[in-house]
């Protein structure tokens, strides 16, 4: 098979030709050295490519996949699940059970539809790299939009991880040292602790040029979340309602609008439809929780027996599993605390159990998972910045260290000064996540899939999806900013 045949991926979707699904098992790359600046920096191999595809890049992109269906499902599930699960109970408390389930179904279905568009665009556009699709569709602006959205989403994810460190590590230290009351000790200050963890653990790991086996620790994250889900379900039947401990904290500004006039009966009665100033955060939180699109194409590339249908089956199984997991976590967390649930569910339990052994174990597991995940998240951010601003330059340790330090410093500043994790979920979910889920896949599809006219059902559907994504992004961002302004003028958080 020659190179022209390899790159000829713009075929009809229903064609029986195996090339339609990027199945290039016949292509055998030659084993000889190829000079490229990507050889100098391992970070750049699977990220932003140059417009002119060299032979090595062709070989890298179209090698036959070797990952099994089950492992691909695990990898995609791992890419989906993250800190967003901790904010879902808060979203349910501010939408009601019925409205939350409706929104959850819609976000799940729309996310799967956008993956369908992305996979078809990858076939038609001849690339399995997200940023490269942006370059082919809209040139440099498209590449910048894709790279910027991925970078912003990763910064948001990293911020949420460090925010968990900021608020959970002091509780773990208090429990391990059996400290009942805090008197302002520096080692119980979350701001100091997140900086120390960043400098002592995250920075050295992030400076590695090749993360190697650290990448396998990312598989620890979904296991921690499953453990967390089991504990949430179990504790629902152990915690009484109403909660006196939670009643003592009902003057929290984030819950005043819901709880200040509630009786015990009202407080323990689930609500099915809720509309308040915090409802606007529901869609961004859900969108943030389902973003996995930058990882879809690399997983597709590695899938054994690669085909669009097989990858959609992987996506369907992964999203269904996450749908069930998210629904159970949100439902049982909400039915435990009702309107008193906080933006970060795990932190809410500290108001009831304090230093309970089981939650110390949960916190330690989650802290270990998020701490080891941050260097993995920094990896693609640094690669994108290197490619955007230092393309073609040889690797330099000074630049490598400086970029890593600036990324980590910027994220620490965000974590220290942003009032709640809700604001991170909301802003990133309404901006970068909306771009990755709604806007970019549909825009790439409309631009790169040439064989379908704009009057076709597929193109009209993609156009409506694009318009809907723009409305969601602008509407959510506007309402979130208005809520911030209202809180700042009223002395809230």
Curated annotation (Swiss-Prot):
Extracellular side: 93-98, 174-184, 235-279, 338-358, 422-423, 483-493
Keyword Chaperone applies: no
Chain spans, region Regulates protein turnover upon amino acid deprivation: 1-92
InterPro entries per record: AA_transpt_TM
Residue numbers on the Cytoplasmic membrane side: 1-72, 120-154, 206-213, 301-316, 380-400, 445-459
Annotated Na(+) binding sites: 78, 373
Alphabetic keyword roster: Amino-acid transport, Cell membrane, Disulfide bond, Glycoprotein, Ion transport, Membrane, Sodium, Sodium transport, Symport, Transmembrane, Transmembrane helix, Transport
Cysteine pairings via disulfide bonds: 241-268
GO molecular function per UniProt: acidic amino acid transmembrane transporter activity; alanine:sodium symporter activity; amino acid transmembrane transporter activity; amino acid:sodium symporter activity; L-glutamine transmembrane transporter activity; neutral L-amino acid transmembrane transporter activity; neutral L-amino acid:sodium symporter activity; proline:sodium symporter activity
Pfam entry (one): Aa_trans
Cellular location(s): Cell membrane
Catalytic activity: L-alanine(in) + Na(+)(in) = L-alanine(out) + Na(+)(out); glycine(in) + Na(+)(in) = glycine(out) + Na(+)(out); L-serine(in) + Na(+)(in) = L-serine(out) + Na(+)(out); L-proline(in) + Na(+)(in) = L-proline(out) + Na(+)(out)
Entry remark concerning the domains of this protein: The extracellular C-terminal domain controls the voltage dependence for amino acid transports activity.
Function: Symporter that cotransports neutral amino acids and sodium ions from the extracellular to the intracellular side of the cell membrane. The transport is pH-sensitive, Li(+)-intolerant, electrogenic, driven by the Na(+) electrochemical gradient and cotransports of neutral amino acids and sodium ions with a stoichiometry of 1:1.
PANTHER family: AMINO ACID TRANSPORTER, SODIUM-COUPLED NEUTRAL AMINO ACID SYMPORTER 2
Name the record gives this protein: Sodium-coupled neutral amino acid symporter 2
Gene: slc38a2
